[in-house]
């Protein structure tokens, strides 16, 4: 409701009109921001930390976090591997700059090399595949949980409902987090 007040001769006249309702996606976005803000504040977290990959899901979660909590309360971490494209790195860096959030880079290649060496006997005689891919995701979750445990921000998972419903995610990896803002949002709405 938009109201204009005029006072004339001791009489206050109010006139106004109702603003049009939000579009469905605008209302959904506002609801996602409200849900995250309420959860973080009611549970006493000083802020949030999330992995920023350069993809659309993590970009949307970062934007929701900034609108819900303010840029100072959002810490993004890029965790590149040998397979991370320069475009993904550039996109994540540009987004963090546009949102005004802290962005740190923690390369996972040294940890992957160490894990592959540690597991070489167990993985001997097999072709690289899903197990190795999942190690990368789990390393990223471990890094975010370490930051959370040390400094207190809650980890945000960046998966969406389509990924969770189809099982297209890694337990203890990209599902890692205290809150998943997109958990009830189908990929088509992301």
Segments (PLM) and residue ranges:
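RNA-binding accessory domains that recognize and position tRNA/RNA substrates
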Residues: 1-49, 66-67
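A conserved beta-strand->alpha-helix junction
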Residues: 2-11, 73-78, 86-131, 137
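Alpha-helix capping and helix-loop boundary segments enriched in small/acidic/polar residues
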Residues: 23, 52, 56, 79-87, ...
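Conserved helix-loop functional segments at active or binding sites
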Residues: 37-46, 67, 71-74, 114-121, ...
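ATP-dependent adenylation/pyrophosphate-handling site
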Residues: 46-52, 56-93
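Residue-level signal for inorganic ion chemistry
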Residues: 55, 96, 156
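Flexible loop/turn segments at secondary-structure boundaries
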Residues: 56-60, 83-87, 105, 111-115, ...
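Active-site adenylate/phosphate-handling loop in enzymes that bind or generate adenylated species
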Residues: 99, 122-190
């Amino acid at each position: 409701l938009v109201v204009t007040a005029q006072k004339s001769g001791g009489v206050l006249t109010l006139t106004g009109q109702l603003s049009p309702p939000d579009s469905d996606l605008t209302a959904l976005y506002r609801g996602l921001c409200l849900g995250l803000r309420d959860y973080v504040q009611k549970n006493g977290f000083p802020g949030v930390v999330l992995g920023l990959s350069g993809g659309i899901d993590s970009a949307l979660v970062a934007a929701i976090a900034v609108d819900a909590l303010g840029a100072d309360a959002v810490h993004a971490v890029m965790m590149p591997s040998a397979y991370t494209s320069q475009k993904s790195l550039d996109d994540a860096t540009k987004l963090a700059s546009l949102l005004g959030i802290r962005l740190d880079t923690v390369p996972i290649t040294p940890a992957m090399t160490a894990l592959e060496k540690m597991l070489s006997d167990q993985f001997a005689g097999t072709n690289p595949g899903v197990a190795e891919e999942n190690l990368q995701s789990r390393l990223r979750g471990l890094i975010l949980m370490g930051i959370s445990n040390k400094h207190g921000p809650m980890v945000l998972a960046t998966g969406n409902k389509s990924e969770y419903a189809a099982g297209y995610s890694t337990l203890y990896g990209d599902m890692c987090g205290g809150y998943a803002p997109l958990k009830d949002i189908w990929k088509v709405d992301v």
